[in-house]
């Protein structure tokens, strides 16, 4: 892959992980990149490492609270951080198990047209659920059932175009979560999944190819991490006072654009 292609893929990975679009759906608009397997696995590991670091920096208070909570849980004196950690784990386990089993085949579940249609439908659902959902619940109100349910929904994000952030935020809004709280818990759920994805991919690379650490990988890590941090900060600032409607419109627009590329013979 060229320098520009690495940069574009890293940007898409970083923004797609935190915004309700999904990197797989966005890459459907750039099939010439999606069709280049060389170096993509290593690039994905590097990009996800940067994204994970970005999430940990942005939500450092929650990360610290969960770390302390783990220690207090081991001492038999659970606190808020302990409960938050357990809720995140409850929401992570279903998606982690399924993802570990089918991750390598997930990208073939639908084609470009299917991913485009899913992008459009997801945008419509996000728009509708954001408008219909009341705003009364926060992360502190999370139940075990709610955590496990939202976590299980992440399994659907294995289908290109669904978007892990998109599906969890959409349902959270329908259930009455505050917008920032919906994004926050979605990102907390993402951390162990991103870590698991990176470990699985790295393990496969280590056993089947010779690992080469290059400047391209460092650039991908930095670019994806910075894109994720800026995208997340921007979205959190926006939804503090506004709705998810612009993100829903962008999803719909991306979907229409991909369909146009497919049916006019450019993809």
From Swiss-Prot:
Asked if the keyword Transmembrane belongs to this entry, the reply reads: yes
Q: Where in the cell is it found?
A: Cell inner membrane
State the annotated membrane topology for this chain.
Answer: Multi-pass membrane protein
- Keyword Hydrolase recorded: yes
Q: Which UniProt keywords apply?
A: Antibiotic resistance, Cell inner membrane, Cell membrane, Cell shape, Cell wall biogenesis/degradation, Hydrolase, Membrane, Peptidoglycan synthesis, Transmembrane, Transmembrane helix
* UniProt catalytic activity: di-trans,octa-cis-undecaprenyl diphosphate + H2O = di-trans,octa-cis-undecaprenyl phosphate + phosphate + H(+)
Q: What is its EC number?
A: 3.6.1.27
Which parts of the chain span the membrane according to its record?
A: 6-26, 41-60, 83-103, 109-129, 142-162, 185-205, 217-237, 244-264
Q: Name one GO biological process term.
A: response to antibiotic
Give the GO cellular component terms, alphabetically.
Answer: plasma membrane
Q: GO molecular function, one example?
A: undecaprenyl-diphosphatase activity
**The protein's role, per its UniProt record:** Catalyzes the dephosphorylation of undecaprenyl diphosphate (UPP). Confers resistance to bacitracin.
The miscellaneous remark of the record is:
Bacitracin is thought to be involved in the inhibition of peptidoglycan synthesis by sequestering undecaprenyl diphosphate, thereby reducing the pool of lipid carrier available.
- Belongs to which family? Belongs to the UppP family.
Query: Any idea what this protein is called?
Result: Undecaprenyl-diphosphatase 1
Species of origin: Paramagnetospirillum magneticum (strain ATCC 700264 / AMB-1)
- Name the encoding gene, please: uppP1
